[in-house]
């Protein structure tokens, strides 16, 4: 299945010797709420869909790199299901391990930084020989915030938002922007900074208040209810878990709310997790194909 969604794009790339790529791209959030779930799917049994697991490239396990070339990134993608009928949720778990955090690189649509720059997911992924691609953040719709890509500071206008920081040493953290600056984060070793939210998990526990209304700048509705989602969790240095959740498709997947999303990260042992751009733009691209089922949108043009 292959669909091209023409969106504003930001790519976060995981590049190795064989151009294995984990790519995050920027797209607008299309806020359409699904209504109340039929039941609490967090109590339902999770089933793994046969034939959808894709094992990582390279040798299994972390392994040391001393005396040999750095190991290739380890990537696995597994499709899972929760609930049934109108309460069914379909989502994908992407487990990523790298030997060098600076292999996580950012790529911009048409290789240009700015607002209202658009391209297709497939084109950007193809230009960068991407093996894997998911949503990123919301930077192109803002004139404020901290934007760091590949160790380059593009914007340093801190706000009250909590941003996600991926450091050169392979660690991940969140920080409220108005307590720091882009230059301070850069000096501390920040490699890439994403700004969306909210924080889902901290210190290995789901953050309190995730049921409360959460609004993104420029949107007049809460995005806390069941929606298509993209989020990243931290398992340890250079080890991350990405969740891609389909939604707005009754009988296939209604999406997840923030509490449900946080619960999955906690169950996998993530000490920190952060919500990225979601909604109508949620897409999982792998090896030239869109492997999830992006929800129908009125138009793919911006």
Spans of model-derived segments:
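A short, polar/proline- and glycine-enriched secondary-structure boundary/capping micro-motif
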Residues: 114-117, 183-189, 219-221, 251-257
């Amino acid at each position: 299945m292959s669909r091209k969604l023409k969106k504003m794009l930001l790519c976060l790339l995981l590049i190795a010797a064989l151009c294995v790529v984990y790519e995050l791209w920027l797209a607008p959030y299309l806020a359409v709420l699904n209504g109340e779930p039929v039941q609490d799917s967090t109590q339902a049994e999770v089933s793994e869909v046969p034939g959808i697991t894709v094992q990582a490239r390279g040798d299994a396990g972390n392994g040391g790199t001393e005396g040999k070339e750095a190991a290739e990134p380890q990537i696995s993608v597994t499709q899972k299901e929760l609930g049934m009928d109108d309460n069914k949720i379909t989502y994908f778990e992407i487990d990523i391990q790298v030997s060098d955090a600076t292999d996580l690189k950012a790529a911009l649509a048409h290789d240009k930084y700015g607002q209202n720059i658009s391209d297709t997911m497939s084109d950007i992924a193809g230009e960068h020989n991407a093996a894997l691609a998911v949503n990123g953040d919301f930077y192109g719709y803002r004139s404020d915030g901290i934007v760091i890509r590949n160790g380059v500071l593009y914007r340093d206008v801190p706000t009250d938002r909590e941003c996600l920081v991926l450091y050169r040493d392979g660690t991940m953290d969140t920080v409220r922007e108005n307590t720091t600056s882009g230059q301070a984060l850069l000096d501390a070793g920040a490699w890439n900074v994403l700004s969306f939210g909210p924080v889902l998990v901290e210190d290995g526990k789901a953050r309190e208040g995730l049921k409360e209304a959460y609004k993104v700048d420029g949107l007049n509705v809460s995005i806390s209810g069941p929606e298509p989602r993209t989020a990243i969790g931290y398992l340890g240095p250079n080890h991350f878990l990405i969740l891609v959740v389909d939604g707005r498709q009754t009988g296939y997947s209604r999406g997840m709310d923030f509490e449900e999303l946080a619960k999955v990260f906690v169950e996998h042992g993530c000490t920190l997790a952060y919500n990225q751009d979601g909604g109508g733009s949620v897409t999982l691209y792998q090896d030239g194909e869109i492997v999830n089922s992006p929800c129908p949108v009125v138009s793919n043009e911006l």
